[in-house]
């Protein structure tokens, strides 16, 4: 019987993680239609005829809101496991989390002061 221990599991998962996307791409190349002509080149707008060009400029404020959202979304991803294991981590982890939150509050204050959160 073949037993995997230690790094063999990691190597197995790494090979599978590399093989699945490659297999998906190769399957797409084999199965997908080859040519795009006529109506297949048009963009899709809810079954309606496309109006105007596909390349339009968006206001930079959308980018700033998205950037601030991503920053605080990542904050939530890092703080959730800390909150779940709060009782077992102790005082040092609490102080580290406070420093992390303080850095993010400073970043929020900076964005607010620069006007990144105002829509005018």
Curated annotation (Swiss-Prot):
Gene Ontology terms, MF aspect: NADH dehydrogenase (ubiquinone) activity; quinone binding
Alphabetical list of InterPro entries matching this protein: NAD(P)H_OxRDtase_bac/plastid (IPR023043), NADH_UbQ/plastoQ_OxRdtase_su3 (IPR000440), NDAH_ubi_oxred_su3_sf (IPR038430)
Pfam families: Oxidored_q4
Alphabetical GO biological process terms: photosynthesis, light reaction
Membrane topology: Multi-pass membrane protein
Bilayer-crossing regions: 10-30, 64-84, 89-109
Catalyzed reaction equations: a plastoquinone + NADH + (n+1) H(+)(in) = a plastoquinol + NAD(+) + n H(+)(out); a plastoquinone + NADPH + (n+1) H(+)(in) = a plastoquinol + NADP(+) + n H(+)(out)
PANTHER family for this protein: NADH-UBIQUINONE OXIDOREDUCTASE CHAIN 3 (PTHR11058:SF9)
Protein name: NAD(P)H-quinone oxidoreductase subunit 3
Species annotation: Prochlorococcus marinus (strain MIT 9312)
